[in-house]
Amino acid sequence: MIMKKSAFMLLIILLSLTANAQTPYHNEDGKKIDKEELETKDYLPEIHGTIRTKFEYQTEMAASRFEVRNARISITGNVLPIVAYKAEIDLSDEGQIKMLDAYARLFPIKDLTVTAGQMRVPFTIDAHRSPHQQYFANRSFIAKQVGNVRDVGVTLGYKFGTGIPVTLEGGLYNGSGLTNQKEWHKEVNYSAKAQFLFAKKLNLALSIQSIQPQEVRINSYDIGAFYEFGRFHIEGEYLYKTYADNAYDNVHAVNSFINYDLPLQKVFSKMSFLARYDMMTSQSDGKAINEETGALTTTDYKRHRITGGITFSLSKAFRTDLRLNYEKYFYAKN
């Protein structure tokens, strides 16, 4: 292995947050409605937004760039106490406009949810984090390359347990992503996730996913956990991916990091110190095929990365973070 590149990044995140009421009916972002004391404002939509701007300097190339990584706007609300909705669009995902979420969510009985539409499927820990929830300037390889899946379908969610709260999620999906929604499918594409919260500090997540983007079925398995104590957050995740009929080599991906928060009194509310190691072996998305041989081709090559960073947080009511990250990538010689 040789060191291939390193980068210095400056990232500013602006997030608009809204306050929550205190009643048993929820919309996608946690708004609660008192069914017995409905008010007109209960049905007013809420607007949320995230802007991420980034400056990168590539030391090996001695080159730099500015980028609007995200400019997300979402609308959430309720049309009935047990019917919520969400629509989210990114006006600048590295310069491209993307429709991310568009779904309705039902709360038929206590602790049960039914979500139908376009959404992120229940799989992995890190891939489920929105931009404002991420710890680093760049997402992990699991969150961006290996386990990042949005699709159209239906998801069921159920929560139970008091001593050890458990959240179960599972659903059926097209399996062809966001753009090919008119295609008919004979194969079954599914994803499921179970989360266990031990002592309110240790979270264990188990996930499984099976999709068939083209001719080859791809099965993925993920296990991850994070532990929070004092000012520390420690997290680790492992993903394993296989291809039917040995159409491509099995894929391994790892994400591990630690975060320490230091409260501050002036200017910044806190300063966070972070360190991360993540890696992935070469993978195919199941769509790229060699025209001559018909075999799957590589879409993402094997790599390792070490990241160190400091995050300065300005506000609690409106989350505003200034992230300074230094990354080193390691690629194979060939």
Language model: regions and residue ranges:
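Cleavable N-terminal export/targeting peptides
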Residues: 1-31
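Hydrophobic alpha-helical segments, especially transmembrane helices
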Residues: 5-6, 119, 277, 324
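Active-site cleft segment of glycoside hydrolase catalytic domains centered on the general acid/base Glu
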Residues: 180-184
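Short, histidine-centered active-site or binding-site loop motifs used for metal coordination
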Residues: 53, 172-176, 239-240, 326-328
